[in-house]
Structure formats: C-alpha cells, structure tokens
Amino acid sequence: MKRHNVRRLLALVLVAALCLLCGAAAQPNATEIHIYSADDLVQLSKSCKLDTYSQGKTVYLDNDVDLSGSDFVPIPTFGGMFEGQGHTVSGLELSGDASHMGLFRYVQAVSTVRDLKITGNIDAAGTLNEIGAVVGTNYGTI
C-alpha cells in the first residue's frame, strides 16, 4: 500500500514538473521588450506606471516610430536598458504646466538609454524644471 502511494506521489510530481516546463517554454522572454509601433510605445508607457516594471528588462526600438496623433503620454519611470538602435521617435508633442517632461519622465539610476533620436515639440509652462526631449529627470545614463 505504501509503495502504491509513493508511486502516485512520484507520478504527480513528474506531471507537475512537466507542466511547469511546458508553461515556461510557451512564454516569451520576459526580460526583452520589442517596440515596433506607436501602440507598442503607448503600452510600454502604461506598463511603466509601476516603477519596478522595467527593472532588469531591455527594451529594443526595432523601427522608427511616429507618435503623431497617438495618445502617448511620457513614460512615467524607467529602470531598464533602452536600446534605440539608431531609430527615431518622431512626433513627440508635450505641453502643459508639468515639470519632468520628456519621452521618459524619470530615468532611474540603474537605467541606460542609448542610440535614440527624438523629434517633436515641447511647449511647457509652469516652473520649467527638468524638461528635455529624452528625459525630464535623469538619474541614469543617457
């Protein structure tokens, strides 16, 4: 009877292990994010509302992206590696009374943003503190 229970337990453990392996193989690489379009950049901005979302991740800009007419808002906080790969983000339009304006509002100390071109307009009012095309407040490496 005990042998039978041990076999059942072993079988359950093996099935559980196989399920975990299949699930891990089906998921994309969670440490890489690829940006192909304005919609992808908008989604990145929404995801980066949580300050730890981008930490340990590398974001690749795989195409030139035109933000004209999109509902893009600056990426709130970024804590990973942003590889522009020589591509351009165009049509960046920022305006308002806020400070900390740029494609990224805050770049964390552990972050790097590189090989990126940006074109657009910034029309800021208020205190005009910490405003730039790439980042409003930078603690990382640009």
Locate predicted features:
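Bacterial N-terminal signal peptides that target proteins for export
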Residues: 2-13
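Bacterial N-terminal signal peptides
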Residues: 12-21
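Surface-exposed repetitive/solenoidal architectures
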Residues: 27-142
